[in-house]
């Protein structure tokens, strides 16, 4: 018995296939989904979705959205997504370092739209970097 996983971004169908296990980055923490899981709807945080299929793990960087689990079908609707195997690890590392420096430079400043945007860029860069390093 397996799951059917669909990961849909606003501009593309990122993944559509079978999976033995899915780990979602929900806003309340990591959420493991196996065949027979109870139906649910959850918010997805910026992070890495992990998929186990045929004994191999694959990663997908997600940039926030929603996931629905119903009758062994997992549908993930996100703002942006990228397969870990298609991410340039060196470029992801550079983007992460730049975002870290930007956020560190704003330390101690009051909250502002610029500071929130910098924090979001850091979270997205971290997700892309993690997905690139855990890709099989």
Curated annotation (Swiss-Prot):
One of its GO terms (molecular function) is ATP binding. Keywords: ATP synthesis, CF(1), Hydrogen ion transport, Ion transport, Membrane, Thylakoid, Transport. The keyword GTP-binding does not apply. It is found in: Cellular thylakoid membrane. It is a peripheral membrane protein. GO terms for cellular component: plasma membrane-derived thylakoid membrane; proton-transporting ATP synthase complex. Gene3D superfamilies: F0F1 ATP synthase delta/epsilon subunit, N-terminal (2.60.15.10), Helix hairpin bin (1.10.287.540). It holds the Pfam family ATP-synt_DE. Residues 106-136 are annotated as: Disordered. HAMAP family: ATP_synth_epsil_bac. Produces ATP from ADP in the presence of a proton gradient across the membrane. F-type ATPases have 2 components, CF(1) - the catalytic core - and CF(0) - the membrane proton channel. CF(1) has five subunits: alpha(3), beta(3), gamma(1), delta(1), epsilon(1). CF(0) has three main subunits: a, b and c. Belongs to the ATPase epsilon chain family. This is ATP synthase epsilon chain. It comes from Synechococcus sp. (strain CC9605). The gene is atpC.
């Amino acid at each position: 018995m397996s799951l059917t996983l669909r990961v849909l971004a606003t501009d593309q169908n990122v993944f559509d296939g079978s999976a033995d296990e899915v780990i979602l980055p929900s806003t309340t923490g990591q959420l493991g989904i196996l065949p027979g899981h109870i139906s649910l709807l959850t918010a997805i945080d910026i992070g890495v979705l992990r998929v186990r299929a045929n004994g191999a793990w694959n990663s997908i960087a997600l940039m926030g959205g929603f996931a629905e689990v119903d009758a062994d079908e997992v549908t993930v609707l996100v703002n942006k997504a990228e397969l870990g195997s298609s991410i340039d690890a060196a470029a992801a590392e550079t983007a992460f370092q730049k975002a870290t420096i930007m956020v560190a430079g704003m330390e101690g400043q009051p909250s502002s739209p610029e500071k929130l945007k910098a924090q979001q860029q850091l979270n997205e860069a971290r997700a892309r970097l993690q997905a690139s390093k855990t890709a099989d």
